[in-house]
Amino acid sequence: MAAGLGVVAAAGNLLGGLFVVRREWPRRFLHYFMALGAGYMLAVAFTDVIPESVRIGGQGAFLFVLIGYFLVHLFEHILAPHFHFGEETHTEMMRHHRARTVLFGLGIHTFFDGVAIAAGFLVSTWLGTVIFVAIFLHKLPEGFTIASVVLASGQSRGKAVAAAGALGVATLLGVLLTSLLQAQLRYALPLSAGVTVYVAATDLLPEVNREPGWRTALLVFVGVASLLILQHLVRV
């Protein structure tokens, strides 16, 4: 099941890229998905993934949550320049952010998305599913972003779609590699929790906060509430 939903998540990247090359979409559409995803991901991490990590691995799980958080920080800010959603439409920014570098950074990011999905399914179908939903909500924005970057750098529409597809492949690799390491679940699950917190709190929320108005901010809380309601319905 993890592999199947990994394919669906990867398709989200590709679909986001196709949307960009077919027509111009308003930025608020992208931010709505990011806001929902940020709230939902934080709720998943703190109410499901971290408690389950502690149940399996004890108090030592918190160390691996921290390692997961800073592992993504290392890749995004040191090994590859950090890229902000929305910069892709500015030609001047493209002089400083080459498409290949952005693709590498987002590729690392999406690889860890796959790790999180697979680690969740190694624990239970419920946990894997809620993590998948959290990640899928920001798959479209990822595809939007990389396709826009490639187009803004002067490359063809075909290459823009291929770049979005490459992010999908990275997601699948994360799913498959983690699924082969079931014995390391006590480490993989808290690592995925740290990755989830990083993506939601450090990547998505700051971009949501750049958007003026109350609607986008409200969607963060809608994301949190949707998971809490789902938990209540499933566990009653």
What positions do the PLM features span?
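Intrinsically disordered, metal-sensing/regulatory segments
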Residues: 1-236
